[in-house]
Amino acid sequence: MPSVPDRAQVVIVGGGIVGVSIAYHLTRREITDVVVLEQNTLTAGTTWHAAGLVSQLKSTQSLTKLAAYSARLFEELEDETGQATGYRTPGSIQVADNEQRWEEIRRGATMADGVGVECREISIDEAAERFPHMRTDDLVGALYIPRDGQTSPVDTTMALARGAKARGATVIENVAVTQLKTKDGKIVGVVT
């Protein structure tokens, strides 16, 4: 296990998917003096509880772009790092049982299409074929998003950690941060 350095440009507290993703993305931007401190082992907190659903159609354009980026990243991460992520893309559908909800879904689809998320309206019959256990007799519309998927949060976190470490980040497990040091209202250090 690496020892905790005296200094680092960036210290990330927490080795779940969010903390490790931050380290991964910082190192992709060539900020490599990054240390991730995890009090237990990577993914030991809430990450391992997550369902890992990757749905790209969100309520705003910014969130839709972020979700689409995540889907692309998850597709490429295993090839980049050699670490399996469990990512698969069975697709998803959004359904509406009233006209107001159907109009909301269609507006979202127009926005998603504008940022490159593939989606298309499908008939109620096609929705029933794709998802035979779903009740469809009360539906007024259905939208199919073929690249939506699911990933293994634990495996994806490990792949992100491997990618971050390959670019220079340090990941240290079994080190608890007990205090944040502040100066003039800013965090300037941690106590372990």
Model-derived features: positions:
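A short, glycine/Asx- and small/polar-enriched loop/turn
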Residues: 100, 131-139, 181-188
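Beta1/beta-strand and adjacent pyrophosphate-binding region of the FAD-binding site
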Residues: 4-18, 35
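Dinucleotide-binding Rossmann-like beta1-alpha1 core, especially the glycine-rich loop
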Residues: 52-130
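Gly/Ala-rich phosphate-binding loop of Rossmann-like dinucleotide-binding domains
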Residues: 23, 27, 163-165
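Short loop/edge segments at beta-strand edges and connector loops
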Residues: 38, 123, 173-175
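Glycine-rich FAD pyrophosphate-binding loop
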Residues: 27-48
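Helical element adjacent to the flavin cofactor pocket in flavoenzyme catalytic cores
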Residues: 143-192
